[in-house]
Amino acid sequence: MRNCIEMGAIVRPKSYQNKNIEGQEDYITKEVICHQYCLTSLGDPKWLFLADKRSKQWVEEEFKERIHDPLDSPDKFSHINPGSAFLIREDVWRPFLVNGKFDYTYNERLRFGWTDSKGINHQDRIWDALKAVRDELIRNPDTRQAVIPIFHPTDVKYIGGERRVPCSMYYDFLIREIKGKKRLHICYHQRSSDFVTHFGNDVYLAWKL
């Protein structure tokens, strides 16, 4: 927070999520770029949720929805969108619903449909990124390919406020030896995170993953 106050740059974005906010002073932001930090232990997570007492309940329900396997749904291949976790912080999330759904959910991104070599999209066939990464880490613990992308190439078509695009870029998992012990590391790259509204939740959800 001190870094943001002392070194942050003032920015005036013209769009926020899927909203046009040009000229709206409420959205003027103080921003820190290329900021890196390292957590070696989480400690008491209560400090991540000071800004909103509902956040702890929300992240627990949101995490369940994120890792839900669509193949376990009564309607096979059915992703969770919008789910019910958003109702815990309804004032934060409801404004971004479009025709009763979000432009994307993490459940859709962690277990996604795929496009074949002919450009045909197969949303009815699930590519389970969580399982693929887990299996590769077991097969090859020294891998540098255990990456789960959240921001997909097609998101570039919707920048500028046409649709919401993920604030998370990817999760990169590495198993490396530190002080004689093998440890699982996660590198979590975000293009943006509201420090008050979302940052603590993002940290906790990445840690649980």
Label the model's feature ranges.
Residues 1-208:
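Terminal, non-catalytic protein-protein interaction segments that mediate quaternary/complex assembly
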